[in-house]
Amino acid sequence: MIYRSKAPLRIGLAGGGTDVSPYSDLYGGAILNATISLYANATIEPNDEKKIIFEAIDRNERQEFDWNNELPIDGTLDLLKGVYNRIQKDYDLKGQGFRLSTFTDAPAGSGLGTSSTLVVAIIGAFTEMLRLPLGEYDMAHYAYDIERKDLNLAGGKQDQYAATFGGVNFMEFYADDKVIVNPLRVKQQHLFELENNLVLYYTATTRESAGIIQKQSKNVTDNKEKSIEAMHQLKQQALRMKEALLKGKLNEIGEILDYGFKQKRQMAEGISNPLMEDIYETAKKAGATGGKISGAGGGGFMIFYCPGNAKYTVMQRLEKFGGYSRNYQFVEHGLKTWTI
């Protein structure tokens, strides 16, 4: 038997960063995101040799171990080993050898939630193999727990919940790891129009999000008013985006994104940089009414809202920066698992 899973990556549309502690614990966070047709994929193939083989196909990395209850977290394939260690501890694989292969449709550090989505996909493959009765909230919290507590990776909570639930969601974040996911019933024509007008542009640079997120968290802990006020405004931006999508006020989306872009830069150093500022201004001059940096910032993907047929001019003008626009569709489903 072969056990497979795939979980969708996400575009953050508004409220990004307010899902990160301690802000979400102190003030409550709100984010609006949508999953897209780029995926993190995982496959588990059992073997009879008591060998554990990890393979990240897209990164050309491979490790092989004799069976062990706990594998070293040493900087190579840590997400794969971290999930294995936790699954083995909680559910006992009873010495079953296997090959775990993964592939992600976007680079790590690109701002689409790749790392957390990959963790969800790996957990999904194990739950398929072990027939574990985990629901969407259970799965997302389990992934969050592995990343933050077992692997000590800094970050928020939205990616894990987007990957498990899928679709367009308004998410609320509170103290004690409380998360509420509100699926939005956006009319199909409005979703098609959003998809048509939203350019997903890869800057051809990646970044380590943890450093930016740690600065952001420290700014809240140190009670830096400028940073905290920016997060308050981003939370309001998520509410405005929710209303615009539900009521079909798509002409407001560019302005909401533009406002959020200006606020997000206030949250921590390193979120934007001269290259991203130049890309942003070029897109606006070409007809985009607003945009944002996807994820924590510092590199990776940017999105631009381009009404009318402005997206063609925007994509053409951005070619000079050496990145590329990525085709996608919005998808309604979250994590999927199956056996063959």
Mark where each language-model region is.
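C-terminal nucleotide
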Residues: M1-G12, D19-V20, D25, I31-N33, ...
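A generic structural signal for short coil/turn motifs at secondary-structure boundaries
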Residues: G109-L112, R265-M267
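Glycine-rich active-site/cofactor-binding loop and its immediate structural neighborhood
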Residues: G299
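Extended low-polarity, hydrophobic cluster-rich segments
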Residues: R99, G135-D138
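DPxDG-like acidic metal-binding loop motif
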Residues: L112-E136
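Short pre-catalytic strand/loop immediately N-terminal to key active-site residues, enriched for Gly-Thr
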Residues: A106-S110, T289
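Flexible, acidic active-site loops/lids enriched in D/E/S/T/G that coordinate Mg2+ and/or position polar
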Residues: Y84, K94-T104
